[in-house]
Amino acid sequence: MGDLKSGFEEVDGVRLGYLIIKGKQMFALSQVFTDLLKNIPRTTVHKRMDHLKVKKHHCDLEELRKLKAINSIAFHAAKCTLISREDVEALYTSCKTERVLKTKRRRVGRALATKAPPPERAAAASPRPGFWKDKHQLWRGLSGAARPLPISAQSQRPGAAAARPAAHLPQIFSKYPGSHYPEIVRSPCKPPLNYETAPLQGNYVAFPSDPAYFRSLLCSKHPAAAAAAAAAAAAAAAAAAAAAYYQVSAAGPQPKAAAGAGGPGSLSYRCKRKRGGAKDCLLAPHAGARRLLLLPRSYKAKAAAAAAAAAAAAAAAAGATCLERFHLVNGFCPPPHHHHHHHHHHHHHHHRAQPPQQSHHPPHHHRPQPHLGSFPESCSSDSESSSYSDHAANDSDFGSSLSSSSNSVSSEEEEEEGEEEEEEEEEEGGSGASDSSEVSSEEEDSSTESDSSSGSSQVSVQSIRFRRTSFCKPPSVQAQANFLYHLASAAAATKPAAFEDAGRLPDLKSSVKAESPAEWNLQSWAPKASPVYCPASLGSCFAEIRNDRVSEITFPHSEISNAVKRTDLTINCLAEGASSPSPKTNNAFPQQRILREARKCLQTTPTTHCADNNTIAARFLNNDSSGAEANSEKYSKILHCPEFATDLPSSQTDPEVNAAGAAATKAENPCTDTGDKTLPFLHNIKIKVEDSSANEEYEPHLFTNKLKCECNDTKGEFYSVTESKEEDALLTTAKEGFACPEKETPSLNPLAQSQGLSCTLGSPKPEDGEYKFGARVRKNYRTLVLGKRPVLQTPPVKPNLKSARSPRPTGKTETNEGTLDDFTVINRRKKVASNVASAVKRPFHFMANFPCPPSLIIGRDGDLWPAYSLNTTKDSQTPHKAHPIWKWQLGGSAIPLPPSHKFRKFNS
């Protein structure tokens, strides 16, 4: 060791020990890794070493001891690799440069892009600027063209901005995408900075910023609307182009008002859209859409926050929040405006459609006053708040859904909702007092819902899930919900027809039917859903509002509310029992999100939801509503099931139709039976609870389609069979908290959904024991003893089942289990394949049991409840055999297992 020289060198503040071997400073690679390059992944370092062709020296025992002596390596190290100083430097430089400079390069690149683009703006030739432009165009479109626009305008067309109608619109609406984009590209260079500094940016949803995309979405569907929107937007943008985003939003209403006052463009379009045609509405909505684009949920959330902050007074705050949503949706919301906007926003709205709208003005004011009552709840006037909230909700949901589903849909829907809202407001103006009262009751829920929703939508579905969990207050709404439910059901019952007639009905039709077809599927269901919301609303003031009135007013409300609900879906569901509409609306956007929200809402509000859900479903089923109505009697028992279906569908992809049908029936039934209604609510909630969410997420489409039939049929059977029991159980559970019913249904629901077959849950297949995986299974001791247990595993996972089953254990047990025949067959099969043999056995279905029904659910009080109780387990719908509840209770099986099963794990 004497000849080994050692020393220490400090590199970048790190003290490394080295040995001098053959005249070279050799550093312990382990120390270089752990100390010098500690923040750099080992794989990166190794790659760099390979790239640099670092020569490694494997130290001998003496060197190893020396390194330990100078504490360069761990005392317990058995070997060490040394690398030379040059290699350490090269490696360090390489790794650090690769990591640090990458970010630096990006920053530099951005800076260069920002600075260089001005010339490039003029030239518009640089590929990089083009890249930035494209990249930022999205931002531009999202945040509103205002900031980027000024930049572009400055750079390229000082006077051209005026020339281009869409110059100030988000690029998506730009008529000159080609020229605009370059500008956008350049402006984005600056705007990115602006956005970074701007609080709005973070919240923005990332829409495809492709102008063509939005334009195609909006313009293709509503060319006239696109033009009108472009004009209106241009005017608004021109006014607010340089203004901050908020101002732009604020400006939106003014231009819109101007358009409304000045010509058909805004007001007419809106009116037409509401009354005359979805297409016309869309025209106006384009402005709305533009605004919507400008008002991604993040802005909305911001607006909501701003509104809340600004609205020191609860009323003002409430109004602001709702307005914020509404404005955001319409692009009207300057955060400050929100308060008075909430009250006046409608006025703006109204002013836009001034003749009809102003009539609302008083009603709106009335509603705002109710808002005064409680900030969040009062926040939204029933219609207004609903619409605003709806819009806001839409925005927030819309933000979410935009990202998940389609921006254009969001925009359009928002527009539609805006229109709808106006429509709703107009109608409200017509039924001022009744509307107001309706608004007040509904507006509480709606505002709360919209507030929570808008916020949550920005957050995430998860947050929504939690929110829905926390929304226990809906139970309080239950009484109202039932009441609303009746009204809603009546409205839904009438509405479905109305909706069917919606095409013929001027107002409702315009909003609902015309918009539905003209706008997207989303919108179609949204309008339908919107009516649903109305019914809930109507529920509050149904006395004042006749069914037709409900149809008309509710419908617009509903539509807007629905939009709101989409976002506020959970809240609304809970608060208003309008979760279904919300989910439906949500459905259009992010189906899964909607599903989740729907199920959340349903889950949260057993009764309330159901009513709204039914109504919503009926409305959503605008087209199917007649059928639904026709079937409503038939579904009276199924009602719960349809409700369930509705919830699930609303949660699911096709909720509109499926949920609509179920909802329609449900709505009608509820109207007929209050008692049943309550149960349906419970059922609905139960089903919709966790199961829907889990299953939807896995296979929302499947569930939607299957659920419609399955829920209806199976649930029909299930509910008819168990209705009396469930009714009692549910009633009792309702008293306990919807949690219990929820629990009960969820077990079934999860199965049904997981299987895509409610029937499996609702009505165990009598042939389960006899047929497995399509093969006839002998009824042996096991089958007799276990009964239809296989049903649980029958879930449609046949392929999975076989693969999931453990062939060996199955085969083994089967030998003991089976009768002689079975045994022989099994032996034969075993030889062929143990998997096949296991088919005869009660196999463990991996996925069938997988989304295990929740054993604990959130109760009304927000606390955890057992998902199943002796109550519910006694019902015909006992928990899934795989459910943990069987592990909690003694005698999980009434019948003892056969000896072969005694020690099996799957006997639960």
UniProtKB/Swiss-Prot annotation:
Residues 337-461, 744-763, 792-818 are annotated as: Disordered. Residues 746-761 have a biased composition (Polar residues). Residues 411-429 have a biased composition (Acidic residues). This is SKI/DACH domain-containing protein 1. Gene3D superfamilies: Ski (3.10.260.20). The lineage of its organism: Eukaryota, Metazoa, Chordata, Craniata, Vertebrata. Residues 370-389, 396-410, 449-461 have a biased composition (Low complexity). The gene is SKIDA1. One of its GO terms (biological process) is regulation of transcription by RNA polymerase II. It comes from Homo sapiens. There is a cross-link at residue 688 (Glycyl lysine isopeptide (Lys-Gly) (interchain with G-Cter in SUMO2)).
